[in-house]
């Protein structure tokens, strides 16, 4: 009788262990992607994320719901709230306003950001150490700001007045222009910030910047990236060169940039997501990742129109 009881107990123990093992891994994961606006950089990041996630988990084992806020940061909140209501397994927030909305929506569902420049600024974390903690981590698209500032003096050595053009609704854009301004002013250049609220007043603000500046700096800024034609339509006819924070902006209105690969950035985020979903990594201790490589690039067409000779070490934008 004791042997029978022992066998039954052992069998129950094995069944219990099997149940625990099966609950650790799901048959299919559901991931919600909130992307702020459709443009080259963010699209590439989303594509890289999806590719990495499908490769790591198997395409049949993951459902990815992609929602785009069409450039309206207020639309991010209902998108991520719907993901929370649907009890998705993970949220990927593509751009700072998407990350801020996701962070406000849930403290339980894992959140990975990408195309976010500075997490401490975006989330209001003082003395940011590189790890957000809680349910948030991700990747940053920050290219070295001191090197971007140096590009301004390298490409426009005679410039005295620098205009810093950015969207006031994007906290990370303000962080970038403040940092670049401090660096340039230490070199003796005069800097003026030109903030536009949204795409509706961009043309007027860009015109004011072009009228008073020898060169304009546009940081990594989602609103600017979605409206480069407006900036180019003002600055190129005025003969004012634009140094851009990322390649998407540069291809539309800039002469040069220090660029990262947004596809690779999104891909790295997707690999992080797979580890979080399978329990291989703890998101609360996962440090924010950064691009491994930055590439100096130039816009051949705009350089030619402005009579500028590309500098050595810069690659043409394809």
Name every feature range the model reports, one short phrase each.
Residues 171-240, 246:
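Pocket-lining segment of extracytoplasmic ligand-binding domains
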Residues 30-50, 65-76, 169-173, 221-226:
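Extracytoplasmic "Venus flytrap"
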Residues 65-127, 218-245:
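Beta-alpha junction/loop-to-helix N-cap segments that form part of ligand/metal-binding clefts
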Residues 248-301:
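Flexible loop/turn connectors
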Residues 50, 55-76, 135, 181-199:
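Short beta-strand elements in bilobed, periplasmic/extracellular small-molecule ligand-binding domains
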Residues 31-33, 49, 137-184, 282-303:
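An alpha-beta-alpha
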Residues 119-161, 260-281:
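Hydrophobic alpha-helical segments within soluble ligand-binding/sensing domains
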Residues 1-30, 55-59:
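Short, low-complexity disordered leader/linker segments with a strong preference
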